[in-house]
Amino acid sequence: MNQSRRILRTVYLSLFLIGLFMLINDIFSSNILSSKSSDKEVQFDLNKSFDDNEMSSVKSNSFNLINKSQDIIVETGIYVATFSTFKGNLVSLKLKNHLNLEKNPTDLINIDRKNETFFDISFDYFVDDLFLYKKIDDFNHEFKAYFKNNGKTYEYVKKYTFSKKDEYLMQFKVTVNGLEDYNLFDFDSYKIIFSSEIERLSDKAKLQYNNYLSQIIYYDNKLKYGKDGLRINNPRWIGSSTKYFGVLVSKENMEVEFKKERGTLKSFIINNVRNKKNISDEFFIYAGPKDNRYLDVFDKRDDNTFGLFDIFFGMSVEKSFWYLIQVPMQMVMQVFYDVIPNWGLSIIFLTIVVRILIFPLTFKGFRATAELSKLQPKMKELQAKFKHDPKKLNEEMGRLYKEEGVNPLGGCLPVILQLPIFFALYSLVNNLFLLRGASFIPGWIDDLSIGDSVYHFGYKLYFVSWTDIRILPFIMMFTQLGSTIVSSNMDLKNLGAQQKFLYFGMPIMFFFILYNMPSGLLIYWITTNIFTILQQYYIKMHLS
């Protein structure tokens, strides 16, 4: 076999593996809600809880209360929070510093106010009136109501405390006290239903972003994904997560059960009140970016307002297999950004640095290919002489390589060894929160976390799932074709049908695979192609 063609096939096999990796990663992320889990189940026995039929009987009054309810808007340095006097719950939580595609604050709560609340508590179904609101100070806000159960009257208070340091965390305290002279509650537990519907997206955003919504849980020092029927005792936290944002809940001595209702997976926080005279439960809710700069401050007591430590919210940021390679890459990107505050340029500079570092491998591979090319006449003679004896041909080929001091895999291995670097760069560019909303070229590449756009259709094209006309995929395709031609020593006129497909078909195939990929990734790919073209010209001049 022509050795140059073997090298070319190795290159395209590597590219195929890259495309397959990205396709699988995209499919997995889009369907992560159904990910399997090998979690252990911790059984618990709660013999008596609220009667579901009793709770449903009071729902008829809900619609009247919703119509009479009042919205309470609380603004902090980072949040615009909207509460409702109906159930005293959050109905909107906007992040002032993180804008959506429409350049409005991102709303982390995505619920239908008529049918669901974000933090649904069992006691809410017994309250047949609106909650009373009290502003204690700028950071503390209280909602109070009363309810009766089995002839007994209870005072029911929800208190929200925001961080004084503008951290993406609030304290949520539930207090229930009996107002009459009796000892213990006559129920064993109450539940909090934690909605998985987070991050409200516009129609345009739904077309641009894949559905990365998932229920996650951290226990036994591992991040796991929730699944229907899973029960866990005392996890460190549970939460709902999208690609870039998360809402995470932590509580001491928490029991959690995951259930699927009407096609949506929800987490039920079960709180044991057996043998208690009153209830005073404290929850800490992180609601913000999946960015370790904000998440890790709750691991050290002195770093946060609430004195929390070892919460490990930072584990909600999924770590890829190539994490150890990603860390220094991100540090290099940050250095470039500190000098020139443009993440697109940081990606370009990082790519150049990486290509320079792996240049010895590239040079070695090209030199091995050149050495093999010199042996082509002798190899053809052997192929003609032993064309009917494959075993003898392999022996003679091996002897020829040994005599000439040539490694037939010398041109392939450098290509394969570069794959982990690409995979690490892909994971970094595809998931780095700092690239969300980061503009490279205003009016064209406005957000490095999604594809570039010069025209938005407003719908998906049926056969190719395109939502926009994009320029970067075309540039990528032509530069990929150019780098392949320059990297090869073959005469294009003498190519067979198979080789022509490798040359011209593969770049076209990758055009479709990468069309909707984040523009940050395509900038990396294009920079790599251009660098490869210049690099190969230099190598050919040097070797000649």
Swiss-Prot record:
Coiled coil residues, start to end:
none
Q: Mind telling me which HAMAP family this protein's record contains?
A: YidC_type1
Q: Name one Pfam family in it.
A: 60KD_IMP
User: Which parts pass through the membrane?
Assistant: 13-33, 343-363, 409-429, 461-481, 506-526
Q: Which domain of life is it from?
A: Bacteria
Any one GO CC term of this protein is: plasma membrane
UniProt KW keywords: Cell inner membrane, Cell membrane, Chaperone, Membrane, Protein transport, Transmembrane, Transmembrane helix, Transport
Q: How does it assemble?
A: Interacts with the Sec translocase complex via SecD. Specifically interacts with transmembrane segments of nascent integral membrane proteins during membrane integration.
What is the recorded function of this protein according to its Swiss-Prot or TrEMBL entry? Required for the insertion and/or proper folding and/or complex formation of integral membrane proteins into the membrane. Involved in integration of membrane proteins that insert both dependently and independently of the Sec translocase complex, as well as at least some lipoproteins. Aids folding of multispanning membrane proteins.
Q: Which GO terms describe its biological process?
A: protein insertion into membrane; protein transport
In terms of one coarse class, where is the protein primarily found?
membrane
Name of the featured protein = Membrane protein insertase YidC
Is-annotated flag, keyword Transcription? no
